């Protein structure tokens, strides 16, 4: 018998158990997985690091080698896959809510984040996972890209040679490095269409002084310092109106535009020329003797030339709301309250631009000039858009604490892209997906990245709700299963998106789930059941949605409730509810954190305790789920949506095949709850406690003790699969917390393929191969 060298090599590979390259998991195979979400910087470190100060929002020292060193912690927890935070190089520096440890400020997609390791470290993590029969999903923050640069020579000495996308972005904002930005007006508003000079839009104090359009001056010359700056050096500026409004076109005098007296807040003086008699304004006509000013607009702008009434120019809150000129309204009618006042009663006002600048001369809509955070987001003039359509939210807003307005590229007279210093947010430019060159480069990148590091799945972090048609192409280029993070609680919207991207985070169900198990929410179970029913009726395949209650951007369950029953019911729902289970690192330890950054603590500071009751509880359910999937009933269990039943509004029954998950919001202090069913079908056992359900008069009585969840499975099958010890094995010192983790581990070991074969078996197989050759 002759055997080629190729056949010999294949024979030796098969004998020695060397696996071929990992094949991409299909969507159906991902349904079998239980995913542990890891924030790389906060999970584990391979070096000695100081205490992690989460409030500082800096890198704490977690890395890929640390994950490799603690894979057994994740595997023993029962998870079969991990999802790690973005891996690419980030912009450095503490701007925009601290350092980019979270991975949302990508600088260069073709370089790895040196804080986490190098190319070999990431490959080692991938290989280590696959060696344990586990899988790797990576977060990709594509929606945070703004770069317009593609340079072939930039990637020398990187892990592969491709054109790149690099953020060549400097800090734009203020004229000097203080806490508040200085927005740059549209270049097109200057008569000569040249860029604005520094002195035309900046002031070196703590607060900016905006410069009006140059075109409003009669002589079209630049504004002088004294024409737009404070009359004296106090903390707040005094704006100077347009010179052209004076009858004689001469400069304004100091007393005409400065505070009536030297207090802490200014009183702006309107144009003298607007009075019907053209005489100077009297003190009482433009000043108010309280602590806060109420500016008085021009009397002459009112159609009837009568004095303004108090309610027309004052607001009784702590901060004034200026009233724009009535004359700018097309109909010359008085401004309505909602047109010039704050959208809601907070500490900061939202100025309303002139209505006359809109192409249709209709009133501005709420969403066009307001933002519900503490800081305002100015809305540029609609007329500057090439198509004259309304600005969309993402075109002028920034979701951080400070605004960075980004004008539309098409508004420049020469139609060239805006330069960084002209508009300047360093990230959050959403137009990258519309540029064919960038789209192609990103698709090339993700394909090469997946192949290089043997990635099994991609998660689109902070996907946003724009460019819907872009994501399927990007996922197709990756060639692996994709999970999109579409942050919306709208069932209809999420299910509609699933027509294009089958994997999505189930935010609608999550919103109901975090409230469902709270003892003080008697309607919570009903609301959760209704939301699950909605998703079932609307979505193409709800079983491919990510099922979760925590992530790096949301409050942790232990901060919402400290009740152990609530926390365990939430864990049981994540792992046994419909969809792909996805648990955020630290939930298995009931870690706290109400908001960012406090919900991102360092896991290693807890010491990876496997005796933690929530760790053991999570491990028990995960191992049961895996054993169930690998059983003869696995296909039915995996592909069946839960039959939903509600008992007395407080108990939720989710039945999938022979498995009944019993969840509740009774709380730890509720002693017992009885639920009776017929014993004809099965004799049930709770695999979490390994206690059989008692039978009375051919009826089985389920008893919910202290609000803890149950997973019911036929008693005989539980014994056969080794999920629970048989009655012969039971002892009096049975641990009430359950000793399932040990027994299931033993059962799983007996079922799983042996990965470390003995030397004798290898030698025997090798001899057999040699005999075949001979």
UniProtKB/Swiss-Prot annotation:
Task: Name a biological process GO annotation.
Answer: carbohydrate catabolic process
**Catalytic residues?**
461 (nucleophile)
Region described as Disordered: spans on this chain: 184-221, 265-333, 376-416
Which coenzymes or cofactors are required? Ca(2+)
- Sorted alphabetically, which Pfam families does this protein's record hold? A_amylase_dom_C (PF09260), Alpha-amylase (PF00128)
Q: What does the entry's cofactor note say about binding and number?
A: Binds 1 Ca(2+) ion per subunit.
Q: Please name every pair of cysteines joined by a disulfide bond in this record.
A: 52-60, 229-314, 495-539, 690-724
Which residue numbers carry lipidation of type GPI-anchor amidated serine?
750
Give me the stretches of Basic and acidic residues compositional bias.
189-202, 274-287, 301-314, 384-397
Q: What class of enzyme is it?
A: hydrolase
Q: Which residues constitute the signal peptide according to the record?
A: 1-24
Topology of this chain in the membrane: Lipid-anchor; GPI-anchor
Where found in the cell? Answer: Cell membrane
- Asked whether the keyword Calcium is assigned, the reply is yes
| Family stated for the protein in its record | Belongs to the glycosyl hydrolase 13 family.
The record's annotation in PANTHER family points to:
ALPHA-AMYLASE 4, ALPHA-AMYLASE FAMILY MEMBER
What protein is this chain from?
A: Alpha-amylase 4
Q: Which gene encodes it?
A: meu7
């Amino acid at each position: 018998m002759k055997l080629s060298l190729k056949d010999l090599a294949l024979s030796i590979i098969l004998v020695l158990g060397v696996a071929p390259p990992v094949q991409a998991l299909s969507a159906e195979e991902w349904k079998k997985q239980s995913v542990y979400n890891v924030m790389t910087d906060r999970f584990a470190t391979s070096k000695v690091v100081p205490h992690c100060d989460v409030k500082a929002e800096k890198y704490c020292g977690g890395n890929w080698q640390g994950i490799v060193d603690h894979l057994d912690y994740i595997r023993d927890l029962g998870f079969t896959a991990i999802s790690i935070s973005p891996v690419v190089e980030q912009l450095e520096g503490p701007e925009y809510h601290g350092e980019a440890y979270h991975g949302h400020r990508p600088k260069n997609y073709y370089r790895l984040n040196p804080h986490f390791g190098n190319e070999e470290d990431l490959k080692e993590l991938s290989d280590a996972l696959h060696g344990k029969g586990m899988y790797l999903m990576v977060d990709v923050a594509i929606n945070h890209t703004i770069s317009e640069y593609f340079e072939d020579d930039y990637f020398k000495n990187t892990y592969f040679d491709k054109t790149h996308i690099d953020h060549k972005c400097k800090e734009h904002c203020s004229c000097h490095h203080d806490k508040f930005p200085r927005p740059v007006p549209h270049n097109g508003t200057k008569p000569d269409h040249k860029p604005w000079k520094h002195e035309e839009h900046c002031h070196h104090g703590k607060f900016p002084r905006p410069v009006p359009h140059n075109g409003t001056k009669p002589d079209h010359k630049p504004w002088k310092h004294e024409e737009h700056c404070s009359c004296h050096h106090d903390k707040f500026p005094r704006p100077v109106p347009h010179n052209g409004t004076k009858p004689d076109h001469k400069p304004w005098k100091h007393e005409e535009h400065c505070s009536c007296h030297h207090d802490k807040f200014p009183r702006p003086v309107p144009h003298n020329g607007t009075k019907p008699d053209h005489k100077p304004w009297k003190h009482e006509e433009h000043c108010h003797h309280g602590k806060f000013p109420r500016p008085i607009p021009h009397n002459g702008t009112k159609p009837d030339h009568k004095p303004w009434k108090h309610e027309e120019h004052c607001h009784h809150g702590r901060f004034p709301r200026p009233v724009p000129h009535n004359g700018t309204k097309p109909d010359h009618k008085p401004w309505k309250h909602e047109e010039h006042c704050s959208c809601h009663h907070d500490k900061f006002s939202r100025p309303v631009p002139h209505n006359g600048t809109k192409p249709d001369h209709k009133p501005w809509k709420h969403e066009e000039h307001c933002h519900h955070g503490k800081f305002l987001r100015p809305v540029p003039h609609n007329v500057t858009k090439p198509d004259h359509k309304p600005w969309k939210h993402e075109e002028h807003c920034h979701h951080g604490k400070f605004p960075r307005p980004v004008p539309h590229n098409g508004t420049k007279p020469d139609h060239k892209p805006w330069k960084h210093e002209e508009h300047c947010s360093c990230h959050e430019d959403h137009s990258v997906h519309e540029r064919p060159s960038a789209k192609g480069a990103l698709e090339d990148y993700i394909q090469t990245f997946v192949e290089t590091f043997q990635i099994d799945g991609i998660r689109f972090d902070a996907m946003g709700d724009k460019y819907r048609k872009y994501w399927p192409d990007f996922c197709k280029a990756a060639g692996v299963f994709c999970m999109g993070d579409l942050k919306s609680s709208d069932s209809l919207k999420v299910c509609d998106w699933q027509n294009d991207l089958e994997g999505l985070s189930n935010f609608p169900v999550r919103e109901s789930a975090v409230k469902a198990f709270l003892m003080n929410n008697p309607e919570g179970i009903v609301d959760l059941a209704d939301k699950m029913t909605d998703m079932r009726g609307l979505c193409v395949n709800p079983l491919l949605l990510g099922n979760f209650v925590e992530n790096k951007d949301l409050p942790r369950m232990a901060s919402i409730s400290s009740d152990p029953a609530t926390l365990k019911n939430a864990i049981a729902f994540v792992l046994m509810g419909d969809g792909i289970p996805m648990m955020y690192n630290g939930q298995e330890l009931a870690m706290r954190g109400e908001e960012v950054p406090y919900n991102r603590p360092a896991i290693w500071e807890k010491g990876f305790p496997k005796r933690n009751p929530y760790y053991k509880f999570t491990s028990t359910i995960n191992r049961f789920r895996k054993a169930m999937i690998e059983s003869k009933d696995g296909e039915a269990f995996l592909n069946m949506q839960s039959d939903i039943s509600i008992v007395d509004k407080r108990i939720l029954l989710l039945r999938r095949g022979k498995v009944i998950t019993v969840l509740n919001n009774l709380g730890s202090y509720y002693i017992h709850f009885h639920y009776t069913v017929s014993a004809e079908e099965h004799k049930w056992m709770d695999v979490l406690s390994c206690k059989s359900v008692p039978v009375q008069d051919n009826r089985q009585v389920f008893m919910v003790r202290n609000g803890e969840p149950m997973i019911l499975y036929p008693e005989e099958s539980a014994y056969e699969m080794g999920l629970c010890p048989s009655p012969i094995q039971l002892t009096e010192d049975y641990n009430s917390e359950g000793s399932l983790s040990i027994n299931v581990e033993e059962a799983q070991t007996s079922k799983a393929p042996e990965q470390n074969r003995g030397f004798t078996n290898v030698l025997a197989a090798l001899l057999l191969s040699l005999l075949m050759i001979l």
